[in-house]
Amino acid sequence: MIVETGHFALILALCVALVQAVIPLVGAQKGWSGWMAVATPAALAQFGLIAIAFAALTYAFVTSDFSLKLVYENSHTDKPMLYKVTGVWGNHEGSMLLWVLILAMFGAAAAAFGGALPERLRARVLAVQGTIGVAFLVFVLFTSNPFLRLEEAPFNGRDMNPLLQDPGLAFHPPFLYLGYVGLSMAFSFAVAALIEGRVDAAWARWVRPWTLAAWIFLTIGIALGSWWAYYELGWGGFWFWDPVENASLMPWLLAAALLHSAIVVEKREALKSWTILLAIMAFGFSLIGTFLVRSGVISSVHSFANDPERGVFILFILAFFTGGALTLYAARASEMQAKGLFSMVSRESALVMNNVLLAVAALVVFTGTVWPLIAELFWDRKLSVGAPFFEKAFTPFMVGLALLLPLGSMMPWKRASLGKLVRPLLPALVLTLAVLALVWVMATGRPMLALGAAGLGAWILFGALAEIWQRAGRTPGRILRLPRADWGKAFAHGGLGIVFAGVGLLMAGQVEDIRVAKAGDSFEVAGYTITLVSVEDVPGPNFTAKTATMEVRQGGKLVATLHPEKRIYPVQAMPTTEADIDNGFWRDVYLVIGDPQEGGGWAVRTYVKPFANWIWAGCLLMAFGGGLSLTDRRYRSAAGARRATVADAVAAE
């Protein structure tokens, strides 16, 4: 009965979404306040109904209701409770239900906290959100229904993919979806602005918090996925340039560009058309990523589903929303003329360059991701585009961004003087040169890569600190009184610098050793003595494992005792490799036990990875900085609304 209630709630949610999509839009066009007022209760009701449906599906997983097809295919009575819950979204149907839940949640948040918005703008934004909700609810109900019953309930289920039974991956999809779907708010604001023919400083102030929130969630989601790949898959890498990974990177880059261009609209009322285009394309690339992950048109090491019928449906959604928005953009963008003028050397120009670099970087990732599909369609050639292409094509744009970032942050609006600009950055430049000298003395492996990474990372980090010092008027007592947005910007930029340094130094200095070892054998890797003490059978809650005990020593002193595993999940008869890592500030010692070899030995892989944890520490700092900025009172206030002189004005400029 609970499952049927959830299914019925999902159908009702579709009906409410239809009302939300049509009635407020007509009301805004006609100026009927009563019709526009329907948007808020409809958005709240839609969220409540989808939450009921999601709760019903969660209940079915927790209680192991194997009469439900989805539970049978993705759960088992022996599975730990955490993975019973995360199994709700560890599959295509459940993940799409989570998608529409988050979509409705953002719409409900806009309805609940959007009281400062002009009445017509709020109605149109919520109507666009409702239209997106209609499309995805139809997709869920007709192609991906999570509430289908089996004629006879089996005694037990088939279990979830063992690779997904991990705490890191349990929370990776929700954060990623919060980012993907969060960009729908920027899209809805962009389409509403195009309908009204109005983009001004107030609009930019309204759209920035939603974009920033989506960017924060994407940052956390990408970091969690990368961290999971690093420690769970056993290959020692953190980014594979796989289509599924690229699907999240592209909207992240465009969301970052949108954040910076919206600042120019807010402060100088320039880049209006470009900002609208970025808002459309950021969500458009979220839909493109969804299509790539779920259609099966491109081979991926971890695609979610390979169903051409679903892929065609998602392609239709992509074409309808992105194509429709771009058509509207082509018709109305010319009305949004820029007001603010600026010189070639100014903060506006630096932000334009920032946008160009980020947008072209996203285009490079997109080209490399879809090129195998293009080659097969037009030339009937099967090929793959791997890490070498992306590293060579993507890296130059990131290097340019790193060099520009501290300079642009210090520039004043409208016009800047190079002489006045360089002076506050001299301490940052001196400290960067000191870091370069230190790395030059200590670097091994690929010293030029290490120098470049350390130099760029230090330049960004020290540049962020120099900006904080400059904004405080070079007075220590004023530093802590700076607005949270200033501190958030410094943390986010500094975190990016740490990521730059971590990625480059890891790639320059990592050491890999692959060998066969027997119990009692010791061997040397990068100054560490590794001893394989034993390999034993250890039972788990829903798996059996060959667990190795391995000691790591340095200079005769025991540093760590690690226990890498080779697991077998009997329900799916699937082996997995569980690495064990001695995490450190300066390096990771990463051990993997492989298959047994002839003569009683075991395949053993050892990696020593310098500065690996700096990558995820930098990502967390970026997300923290974004969150700190989001708590700034200037984001929470309705100042933008107060600056809108006529709430119902349709055309301006």
Swiss-Prot record:
- Entry keyword annotation includes Transmembrane helix: yes
Any stretches that span the bilayer, and where are they? 8-28, 42-62, 97-117, 125-145, 175-195, 210-230, 245-265, 273-293, 311-331, 358-378, 393-413, 425-445, 449-469, 491-511, 610-630
Q: What does this protein do?
A: Required for the biogenesis of c-type cytochromes. Possible subunit of a heme lyase.
Enumerate the InterPro entries for this protein: CcmF_C (IPR032523), Cyt_c_assembly (IPR002541), Cyt_c_biogenesis (IPR003567), Cyt_c_biogenesis_CcmF (IPR003568)
What is the official name of this protein in its record?
A: Cytochrome c-type biogenesis protein ccl1
Localization recorded for this chain is:
Cell inner membrane
Alphabetical UniProt keywords: Cell inner membrane, Cell membrane, Cytochrome c-type biogenesis, Membrane, Transmembrane, Transmembrane helix
From which source organism is this entry? Answer: Rhodobacter capsulatus (strain ATCC BAA-309 / NBRC 16581 / SB1003)
GO MF annotations for this entry? heme binding; heme transmembrane transporter activity
**Predominant location category:** membrane
Topology in membrane: Multi-pass membrane protein
Q: Name one Pfam family in it.
A: CcmF_C
Q: Name one GO cellular component term.
A: plasma membrane
Family membership noted in the UniProt record: Belongs to the CcmF/CycK/Ccl1/NrfE/CcsA family.
Q: Could you provide one GO biological process annotation from this protein's UniProt record? A: cytochrome complex assembly
